[in-house]
């Protein structure tokens, strides 16, 4: 039976058990930290902060590691350094974090430089050292998911031994609980709904940005959708190579249009689902041939997915960019 629940939990039937999701994630992060011999982790990227604290990063914070950050020390609850006085709201909205562990950040922005940046990174580091000393792990390696040259120099003066913290977090996040798997299915359902909506909306004469705007409006109407990074609309000559953007270009009859729901975020779970449409006309035999070829590549790679295989095994089902399109190397075909 397919999942019998929707976007929101209700009283009379089982939905996503968010308490179980939070506990599962924190256990996996702690296990990864221990497995890599770390005494603590400093997490500055949104996906890692979300994983260990289950708190929401505002959109304007997401590309600026350090405006808010989290510290996970061995044997203790996560510490959240929230941007400014937003912590007041975190204490109300996220009671699973102890009140005393919600603090204001000593806001840092990646790559900051200049005299004022040194004063700020000193405050940032002093608070971090206090957390490590309180937990008795000051002399243990600190895993970091981000670092820049100013932090490196200041950490060295403070006697902090830092190392890779992104790999442990990626290992933790790679395995999904049954609840998390259902979350991904819900995201897939939202993407299916958007693509069906586009079959009703697309028509010649619309511009790419009009189509993108409709997609944004449609997606943000779903409960739990907190961010839509992009709705890519590439039409006609923009469809190949797919320029992965949108513009004021007018869609003409019979053209191919690629629509990509790029990083729709529902309760922290993301998408990347794209489909190709022939708008206002019938696909040519050449278009059908390309479609059949691409569909074969896709199905062959899906069939290769099973426990124990590597991403290399899956990628081997796809063609060589050098042989197929004459590119210089595989990186030129990155999408």
Task: Map each language-model feature to its residues.
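Active-site neighborhoods and metal-handling regions in enzymes and metal-associated proteins
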Residues: 1-335
